[in-house]
Amino acid sequence: MQLSTFSHSEDELLKKANWLAGFTLGEIAHQLNIDVPLDLRRDKGWVGQLIETALGAKAGSKPEQDFAHLGIELKTIPINHKGFPLETTFVSLAPLTQNTGITWQTSHVRHKLQKVLWIPVQGERHIPVAERHIGQPILWEPSCEQEQQLKNDWEELMEYIIFGRLNEINATLGEVLQLRPKGRNRRSLTAAVNQQGERVQSLPLGFYLRKQFTAEILQNFLRSPL
């Protein structure tokens, strides 16, 4: 299989993703001449970058989808031996300024989640990174119910941002979507607006999918008829 090449169609992309299933990260990294880190403590995004490279994705963390010409976003998801997600899934940065007039329909979150190619990967820490296996890909589009859940949470969380209630935001807000600091460290600051409408400095905030939500996606796939 020719990896790291442009996919002209959804079928072509899915063929590559299905071909990856069953290989270890080390085997794919070897094919791509990419070094495998001993652990992911300092290379948190390495697995995602490896799969992106293998499948020829281009966007990275930019607002557009990884396969914009196909309308598909790529997400790797670390799972345990029971197939349950080990961490929340980053979707996009939250707009802390210039957010007047943004609606769910025009939001980066909705754009990124319109169609997602999920790639489950073994993520338990006792398994050496190179020996972790890649799972079966899942091409997912949110159901009407799932989109409504996402919309409700997004609108609630954006209210906190638009009205400058940044100090009230915490990870318990939102049923399926949450807002959390997204930065390399506590010194990574960006512009925001407080309740008085004044420009202030804040930690960048990111929208994340809760583990229960992504677990439902994985479980629905396992239950679906082949």
Swiss-Prot record:
A matching Pfam family: MutH
GO MF assignments: DNA binding; endonuclease activity
Coiled-coil regions, chain positions: none
Gene Ontology BP annotations: DNA modification; mismatch repair
Keywords of the record: Cytoplasm, DNA damage, DNA repair, Endonuclease, Hydrolase, Nuclease
Compartments reported by the entry: Cytoplasm
Record-linked Gene3D superfamilies: DNA mismatch repair MutH/Restriction endonuclease, type II
Signal peptide: none
One GO cellular component term: cytoplasm
Coarse class of the protein's main subcellular location: cytoplasm
Cytoplasm found in the keyword field: yes
InterPro entries recorded: DNA_mismatch_repair_MutH, DNA_rep_MutH/RE_typeII_Sau3AI, DNA_rep_MutH/T2_RE_sf, Restrct_endonuc-II-like
Protein's job: Sequence-specific endonuclease that cleaves unmethylated GATC sequences. It is involved in DNA mismatch repair.
NCBIfam families: mutH_TIGR, PRK05070.1
Family from the record: Belongs to the MutH family.
UniProt protein name: DNA mismatch repair protein MutH
